[in-house]
Amino acid sequence: MASSLAPATKAATNLRLTHSLRFSPKPNNLRFATKPGNTLLCTRVKAQLNEVALDSSSNATSPPMKAKSKEEPPAKPLAEPSSSVLATQESVSQFITQVASLVKLVDSRDIVELKLKQHDVEVTIRKKEAMPQPPPAPQPSVVYSPPPPALPPPPVPASTPAPTLARATPTPTSAPAVKSAKSSLPPLKSPMAGTFYRSPAPGEPSFVKVGDKVKKGQVVCIIEAMKLMNEIEADQSGTIVEIVAEDAKSVSVDTPLFVIQP
C-alpha cells in the first residue's frame, strides 16, 4: 500500500488548483510510510468541485483527475392514483347515471317531486307544476255606479171625447109597408149552388130589372156551376118587384133570387 501511494503523494505536491477549495475546520492527519523509519505528513483536503484540472511542471504528466460528482437521486415516478380516488370517481359517475335515469322516470310517470340522497350529495327533481307559481296579478277593482233615476213619463193629456155625429133617423115612409107587401109573395128560389149573374156577359144589360113585366119561362138570370152557365127562368108571369140576390155573388140551393108579383 505504501509503494502505491508514493507516486500520488509526490504528484500532489506539484498540483495547481483552478477552483476555490473549502477546507474542513479540523483536518485529519494521515500518515503514509514511504521507507522504513521515515514518515510523511499529508493533509486531507476536501474540495467541493465538479472537476479539478492538474498541471505538472515535471516531464511526466499525469492524466487529469475528475472528481466524482454526487449522483443525483433518480426521479421518483409519478404517484399512481390511489384506490380511494378511483372509487370516488366511479361512485360519482354511477350517481350521475342514476340521476339521469331518475329524470327520465319523472318525465314518464305521474311524479311531481323526487328527492335522492347518497352520501353527502342530495338531489331534488321537480316538475314544472311543483315549482312555486308567481302570485296572480291583482285584478282591477270595478266600481259599480248605480244608473241615474229614470225620468217620470210626461203626463198624458186628457183625451177629449170624439164628437159623435148625430145620425138622422130617416122618417118612416111607405116603403116598409110595400116591403111587407112584397115579403108576403113567394120568391123565385135558386135551383142549384153557384154564382148569380144578372147579365149574360160583363158590360151587357141585365136580363130584367125592377118594374119589368116577365112571362113564365122567360130567362131572368144565369147561375154558373161547374164552369157551366145555367139559365134560370121565371116560374110565373108578373112584374119584377124586387131583386133579392146580389150580382156576381155565390148562392146556394133555395136562395131567394127575385120576387115576382103576379
UniProtKB/Swiss-Prot annotation:
One of its GO terms (molecular function) is acetyl-CoA carboxylase activity. It is found in: Plastid, Chloroplast. GO terms for cellular component: acetyl-CoA carboxylase complex; chloroplast. Residues 161-185 have a biased composition (Low complexity). SUPFAM superfamilies: Single hybrid motif (SSF51230). Gene3D superfamilies: 2.40.50.100. Pathway: Lipid metabolism; fatty acid biosynthesis. Residues 53-84, 125-185 are annotated as: Disordered. Residues 185-261 form the Biotinyl-binding domain. The keyword DNA repair does not apply. GO terms for biological process: fatty acid biosynthetic process. Keywords: Biotin, Chloroplast, Fatty acid biosynthesis, Fatty acid metabolism, Lipid biosynthesis, Lipid metabolism, Plastid, Transit peptide. Its main location: plastid. The modification N6-biotinyllysine is found at K227. InterPro entries: 2-oxoacid_dehydrogenase, AcCoA_biotinCC, Biotin_BS, Biotin_lipoyl, Single_hybrid_motif. Residues 132-160 have a biased composition (Pro residues). Residues 1-47 form a transit peptide. This protein is a component of the acetyl coenzyme A carboxylase complex; first, biotin carboxylase catalyzes the carboxylation of the carrier protein and then the transcarboxylase transfers the carboxyl group to form malonyl-CoA. This is Biotin carboxyl carrier protein of acetyl-CoA carboxylase, chloroplastic.
